[in-house]
Amino acid sequence: GDGTVNEVLNGLMQAQKEGKRAALGVICAGRGNDFAAGPGIPEDIPGGCQALKADQRQWIDIGKVTGGVYPDGRYFVNNVGVGFDAIGTIEVAKLPQWGMLSFMIAIIKTIFLYYKGPVIKIDYDDQTLTSDTLMFLTMNGRRMGNGFQMAPESRLDDGLFDLVLARQVSRLRIFSLIPHFMKGTQGTQPEISTWRAARLSITAVKGTLPAQSDGEILCVDGTRLEIEILPRQIEVVCAAKKD
């Protein structure tokens, strides 16, 4: 799953510091398997084995996040999320592996458990934005939650994160936004802003930051995160070469 991919990624980066390099290969057997959608890795086990055998590779960007329980930094490959999705991550971990159903149950629970998000300040590429927020995503990959198209135009090798800000809305409005996130059309909605950046920091102005990275909890009451992209840092074994 994505959490295991994250752990292996951090091991590969430690090996790089010691002068050793290896490619990242993935056989999908987790709850979400969202990273795999980016480089075209098959989400079934036989397909994943065939991809490893074919050994076609792609250089991809990764991210590094500093803060929370990782004051010295932690590498990630798919995303960092602040707010609603981090609470959802905690809730989905309590459930059996039921695929999309697990994530939908967790979302519904989170809508009622976690309603008022923090006010955050986002500093990115010499610009600053302060906003109330339901959820703020730093996406390297495209997908989260076993199929939600959070950043449908994201590329793993463009040297940029796709940023998604969902402002605070009513509970009823959250329900109506869910289909847009499933289809990747959330950018058409007035409460959603999307843009790109290579480096950013997130600071809690009011409230605290619950945050996750690749489905693993970074903090539940953090105050600041710093995030940067590392272009084309590792090789991934993928199903087919990407243009």
Residues covered by each model-derived region:
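Glycine-rich phosphate/pyrophosphate-binding beta-alpha loops
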Residues: 81, 85, 137-151, 217
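Gly/Ser/Thr-rich active-site loops/lids in small-molecule metabolic enzymes
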Residues: 96-105, 147, 152-173
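A generic structural signal for short beta-strands and their flanking turns/coil linkers
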Residues: 116-118, 132-134, 157-162, 196-198
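Short, well-ordered alpha-helical microsegments
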Residues: 5-6, 220
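Polar, low-complexity loop segments and adjacent catalytic/binding residues used for recognizing
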Residues: 2
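Short acidic/glycine-rich loop or secondary-structure boundary segments that cap or lie
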Residues: 85-88, 130-132, 144-147, 171-174
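ATP/nucleoside-binding phosphotransfer catalytic cores, i.e., glycine-rich phosphate-binding loops
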Residues: 124-125, 130, 155, 165-243
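Catalytic core of DAGKc-family lipid kinases
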Residues: 10-134, 138
